[in-house]
Amino acid sequence: MSHEVQIHEAQTKILRELLFLPETNFASLQKVSGLESDHVKFHIKRLVELGYVEKQGAKYRLSIKGKEYANKLDTDAGVIERQPKVAVLLIVERKHDGQKQYLLQERRKHPYFGYWGAPTGKIRWGESILETASRELAEETGLSASFEYRGINHERVRHTGTGEFVEDKIFHLMFTNNATGSMKSEFDGGRNAWRTMAEMKREPKKYKGFYEEMEAGIEGGAFLEHVQEYSKEEF
């Protein structure tokens, strides 16, 4: 869930000004906004309501929340910088009939509809990486496990038709071979299955970084960075 709201360009200018000052007065904020007095009052009031700005006497300054928000600004462009998504990728291993199997998921939502790969999940605000791994496993599979950190994978996805990056993700690779419980076969947005790597070689629709991610998560000590290309139909 996002904890941020879209703000007006004038409000962004006000936050940028306050980012470089301990505090300042109304006249200074009006000057940087380029607006008439009534309009500036409206925008400052809105920033106070959002909890980004505090007023003390005749002075204005950033609140703790405002400092954190304004620090994300690209100060040249005056917009919030777009940043990579940060998530966990779970390598869950078990032995069954003498073979190593891995808990994998078929994605049943866009993007990558129908693709197979390891479970993933975004890290929530204030949540540790280990907490995320345990929560995501429980929510999507019904299983419980303790995880080991095995490495990091920075994956950027480029659209083959336009050449533009459509995704930028940082995955923390988490490994376990001690999962317990009864696995859910389906969840909101996909289905789960235990599969061997040999079975996955015959699977036509799997993420393009699948083997690199799995090997890195199994072996450990990984630092991966790569660009994957997907067409409009694949994405």
Model-flagged regions — what are they?
Residues 1-14, 74-75, 80:
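Short alpha-helical segments that sit at the start of domains
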Residues 33-49:
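Short amphipathic alpha-helical interaction segments
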Residues 5, 9, 17-37, 113, ...:
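Nudix hydrolase/Nudix homology domain
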Residues 123-147, 154-210:
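Unchanged
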Residues 12, 76-117, 145, 175-178:
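N-terminal strand-loop-strand
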Residues 35, 99-139, 143:
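Conserved Nudix-box catalytic region and its N-terminal flanking loop in Nudix hydrolases
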Residues 59-89, 164:
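Acidic, metal-coordinating catalytic segment for phosphate/diphosphate chemistry
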